[in-house]
Amino acid sequence: MLTLDKFEEASEKVKEVTLETKLIYSDFLSDQTGNKVYLKPENMQFTGAYKVRGAYYKISTLTDEERAKGLITASAGNHAQGVAYAAKCYGCKAVIVMPTTTPLIKVNRTKSYGAEVVLYGDVYDEACAKAYELAEKEGYTFIHPFDDLAVATGQGTIAMEIFKELPLVEYILVPIGGGGLATGGSTLAKLLNPKIKVIGVEPAGANCMQESFKNGKVTTLPSVNTIADGTAVKTPGSNIFPYIKKNLDDIITVEDDELIVAFLDMVENHKMIVENSGLLTVAALKHLGVKDKRVVSILSGGNMDVITMSSVVQQGLIFRDRIFTVSVLLPDKPGELAKVSQTLADVQGNVIKLEHNQFVTTNRSAAVELRITLECFGTEHKEQIIAALEKKGYKPRIVRTMI
């Protein structure tokens, strides 16, 4: 059972290995949403995510015999690092089963804490089944990433810190994968203030908790499809579901495109790297439907590999109309490219890529296609560039940007 005294005990325990991350007031997000928005930056933890809270507290509740057997878990990344680091602190062996799709940074960081990593399956649920199999075969003690009350208690210590710093908080947004943080966070928040609103946020492509809420029971999704790999879970926790059903006020889902834009917002306005799952609570702010409220968004982690980061930045710039590609047809004769270039230069269009296709028509003397990828200042500047091309007699056509 989740009780206030257990949360208080866990809060003291996790101080041994965690930072008490301080709330950051966001002028940008406050202006965007009409609320007073604060960020709880758990991406600043030593392990890059909040998960070490639940892992460390759970291991502290085990017997010496259970720890001596060695620990095993399954994780898409952040719980893996939490268990690996906590096990290292306790001097325990740790085996971590991770999906084959786990970002390289999370795999390498997990190994760096001394854990043995087994890559198996495409999603968390498949990795979890493998971990249970190995636990039974080798006698390891299994540490569930979310469907465990001790783990949820450790995760819930975040709410204790939020109330300590912002006692009059009115809304807390929590990301949901399997539901551990939502369980601990919402339960403790309601114990501290029954009137507070706690909102869960899931990826639209992995909304297992939302479906479970609708059906009134734990529901398994047939598949998941989201860039938020840390919350790509098919089945939420059955042991913790009753707590979530009781204490969570609502669930919001967000699209991958919204996460991409949120990533750019955090980089440009807060100079912070937050992984896609951690951005759920930022992207959800515009769907909250309230004004003039004190809102805390929990940034659950910041473990993102550089390749993914690069892709997200590029896509974000495209969504923001900061990068776009335009196609024009022009005669295949000397000087035509120079004319187009001058037209773009006159309106400060910065060319970053050119593709010249002579085979777009059967008569290349009549027309060749020029595809120009440009960097600009935003939608208004993009429209100015298009207008300048039209004024010169071209018929510009916006096409998909491929970088």
Label every PLM stretch briefly.
Residues M1-I403:
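PLP-dependent amino-acid enzyme catalytic core
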